[in-house]
């Protein structure tokens, strides 16, 4: 049985669904995915998400967000760390995404937070993805 990287799978599904202008996308449930989606919702990159169950398997239904001209709010969403290549950063060396217009999502000892929060709290962590 193949093991999937749920975060990478989620990022790919969000990217593909927003490019073809779908209204929503279903993702496999995981605590990491839920934490990342909470940040994306707080930062205004998605409308909302809710939980559902199909045939005993838990899913997250994500409602994608578009501007007035039906352009996706998520222009680019890229994984930074992968299962085979984890990338860590201290708060001092946290990269800026699109000169401050994008966000960096990291996994730290305080949970999944944005790069801006990590700098304010002076904690580093694993760089999960960048969004702009």
UniProtKB/Swiss-Prot annotation:
Protein's UniProt keywords contain Protein biosynthesis: no
GO aspect biological process, one term: translation
GO (cellular component) term, any one: ribosome
Domain of life of the organism encoding this protein: Bacteria
Signal peptide coordinates: none
Keyword set, alphabetical order: Ribonucleoprotein, Ribosomal protein, RNA-binding, rRNA-binding
Record bears the keyword Ribosomal protein: yes
GO MF annotation terms: rRNA binding; structural constituent of ribosome
Cross-referenced SUPFAM superfamilies: Ribosomal protein S8
InterPro entries on file: Ribosomal_uS8, Ribosomal_uS8_CS, Ribosomal_uS8_sf
Membership in a protein family: Belongs to the universal ribosomal protein uS8 family.
Function text: One of the primary rRNA binding proteins, it binds directly to 16S rRNA central domain where it helps coordinate assembly of the platform of the 30S subunit.
Self-association state and partner proteins as the record states: Part of the 30S ribosomal subunit. Contacts proteins S5 and S12.
Protein name: Small ribosomal subunit protein uS8
Native organism: Borrelia garinii subsp. bavariensis (strain ATCC BAA-2496 / DSM 23469 / PBi) (Borreliella bavariensis)
């Amino acid at each position: 049985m193949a093991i999937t990287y749920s975060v990478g799978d989620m990022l790919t599904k969000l990217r593909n669904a927003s490019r073809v202008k779908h209204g929503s996308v279903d993702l496999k449930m995981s605590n990491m995915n839920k934490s990342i989606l909470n940040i994306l919702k707080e930062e205004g990159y998605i409308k909302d998400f809710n939980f559902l169950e199909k045939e005993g398997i838990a899913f997250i239904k994500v409602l994608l967000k578009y501007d007035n001209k039906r352009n996706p709010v998520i222009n680019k969403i890229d994984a930074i760390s992968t299962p085979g290549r984890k990338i860590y950063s201290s708060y001092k060396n946290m990269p800026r995404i699109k000169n401050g217009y994008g966000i960096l999502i990291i996994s730290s000892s305080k949970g999944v937070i944005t790069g801006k929060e990590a700098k304010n709290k002076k904690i580093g962590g694993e760089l999960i993805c960048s969004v702009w």
